[in-house]
């Protein structure tokens, strides 16, 4: 595990109002850094409607951070008991996406390769597979029909970021003539941020998290990637961003992700 995966030194629960716009010191957790990275990617492209799937607390935190910063976003979060526009679960999510009414979605994978292909099936040959992953759950449909997708995986290792996935649940690029509405925008990991370029089917390294180097990223990545001319260290969360994450964002997430809020933000849902 790299320094970027370690717990940052714990700081106060909220910054003073006089310092809200100053960059934060090293008093943040990796999960907070990744939520901020995703939020910045969200704001980089005009967006109206974002959908967040199940068991996705860090992308959900990123979306709520954008909202609390004033972005006029519509959020659709599966399994949220209050404020959820869906009454029929994922069926309505797929309907909206097929109609072109979802601008952004998030996907991960047990394996992700250099062409942004995702493997949510497992490794080894069917039926006696070596490892079984949770399953595709409509990921290919969402990947094809959403305007853009941010890929996300906390673990950054050669067993996850591979040269070629063992099975393709959702392809990152398609043959000419195959209709798809969008592609991956980026891949955020516990070590760095990659941007994806569908026209050439490759990732480029965009920024490196504190404690990592280009050499360490190459050593822990199973696929080849380009390096942007201006690649540098991933900017740390500002005190304003941390204050929102630990306050207003956590308030929105306590019901759906109580364990995540307790572990990351140190807050528990009232009995």
Where are these regions (language model features)?
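Short secondary-structure junctions and interdomain/linker hinges
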Residues: 41, 45, 49, 224-228, ...
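A conserved C-terminal secondary-structure "cap"
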Residues: 229-271
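Intrinsically disordered, low-complexity segments enriched in Ser/Pro/Gly/Ala and basic residues
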Residues: 1, 12-15
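Alpha-helix initiation and N-capping motif
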Residues: 59, 211-214, 242
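Short, surface-exposed, charge-dense and proline/glycine-enriched linear segments
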Residues: 79-86, 106-108, 139-141, 256-271
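N-terminal active-site beta-alpha-beta segment that forms phosphate/nucleotide-binding
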Residues: 6, 14-93, 101
């Amino acid at each position: 595990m790299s320094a970027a995966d370690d717990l940052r030194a714990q700081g106060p629960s909220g910054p003073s109002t006089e310092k809200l716009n100053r960059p934060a010191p090293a008093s943040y957790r990796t999960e907070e850094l990744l939520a901020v990275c995703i939020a910045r990617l969200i704001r980089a492209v005009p967006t109206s409607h974002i959908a967040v799937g199940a068991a996705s607390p860090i992308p959900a935190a990123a979306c709520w951070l954008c909202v609390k910063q004033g972005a006029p976003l519509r959020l659709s979060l599966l399994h949220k008991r209050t404020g959820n526009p869906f009454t029929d679960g994922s069926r309505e999510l797929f309907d909206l996406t097929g109609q072109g009414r979802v601008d952004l979605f998030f996907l991960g994978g047990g394996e992700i390769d250099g062409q942004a292909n995702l493997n949510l099936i497992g490794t080894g040959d069917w039926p006696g597979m070596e490892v079984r992953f949770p399953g595709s759950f409509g990921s290919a449909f969402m990947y094809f029909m959403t305007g853009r997708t941010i890929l996300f995986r906390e673990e950054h290792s050669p067993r996850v970021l591979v040269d070629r996935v063992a099975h393709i649940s959702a392809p990152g690029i398609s043959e000419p003539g195959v209709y798809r509405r969008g592609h991956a925008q980026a891949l955020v990991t516990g070590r760095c941020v990659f941007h994806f370029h569908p026209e050439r089917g490759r990732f480029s390294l965009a920024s490196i998290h504190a404690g990592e180097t280009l050499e360490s990223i190459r050593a822990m990545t199973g696929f080849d990637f380009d390096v942007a001319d201006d690649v540098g260290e991933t900017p740390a969360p500002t005190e304003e961003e941390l204050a929102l994450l630990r306050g207003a964002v956590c308030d929105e997430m306590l019901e759906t992700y109580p364990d995540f809020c307790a572990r990351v933000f140190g807050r528990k849902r009232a009995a």
